[in-house]
Amino acid sequence: MSKKSNKNLAFSLLGLIISMVLLSFASVPIYNLFCKVTGYGGTTAKETVSVYSKVKGTKPIIIEFDANVDKDLPWRFIPRQQRVQIVPGQNTLVFYETENLSNNDIIGTSVYNVTPNKAGKYFVKIHCFCFEEQLLKADEKVLMPVTFYIDKDFELDPEMQDIKVLTLSYSFFKVREIASLRGNTKY
């Protein structure tokens, strides 16, 4: 191979590596945008301002809560309530308990999903901890609030008539660990 073809190959490989790194950082925002636009994957609606509904529905719905932690994240993460029964339009506050089981400060982030997927568009989050980095110090335990309601139009949608239970599921993933010695950070 000539020096010119070696240079071309090196630049091509470098470009490929840079593209892969950039794509990996952009994948979560791109996925979030895709889910928000298409409603795919049980993505919920999100209120930008806390709107407290004055009119409530009549059909009770059970909301179950699920919590998962990636194997690389030494946290305990559980819902404080296993389930609640609400009616559409009823604002609801629940908590998830999170505990860092390690000797190091760790930053994690969570993603969520609502099942059945077709009902996700009616699940409106007013406040939650998802998609935001959460720092838990070594051995720290915190309560993380989620405020939500089911849109009143849920009752009017014929496709929702058979749904009596929704599940809100969160999964936490490790972003990075901060070593116990100051100034030393693991990435």
From Swiss-Prot:
TM stretches of this protein: 10-30
Fetch the SUPFAM superfamilies from UniProt.
Ctag/Cox11
Provide Cytoplasmic-side residue ranges: 1-9
Q: How does it sit in the membrane?
A: Single-pass type II membrane protein
Q: Which UniProt keywords apply?
A: Cell inner membrane, Cell membrane, Copper, Membrane, Signal-anchor, Transmembrane, Transmembrane helix
Please tell me whether the keyword Zinc is annotated for this protein. no
Q: Which domain of life is it from?
A: Bacteria
In which compartments does the protein localize? Cell inner membrane
What does the entry list under GO cellular component?
Answer: plasma membrane
Q: Which residues form a coiled coil?
A: none
Q: Which residues lie on this side of the membrane: Periplasmic?
A: 31-187
Q: Name one GO molecular function term.
A: copper ion binding
Question: Where the protein is mainly located, per its record?
Answer: membrane
A Pfam short name: CtaG_Cox11
GO biological process terms, alphabetically, are: respiratory chain complex IV assembly
The record's section on HAMAP family has: CtaG (MF_00155)
The family line of this record is:
Belongs to the COX11/CtaG family.
Function (record text): Exerts its effect at some terminal stage of cytochrome c oxidase synthesis, probably by being involved in the insertion of the copper B into subunit I.
Name the record gives this protein: Cytochrome c oxidase assembly protein CtaG
Q: Which organism is it from?
A: Rickettsia felis (strain ATCC VR-1525 / URRWXCal2)
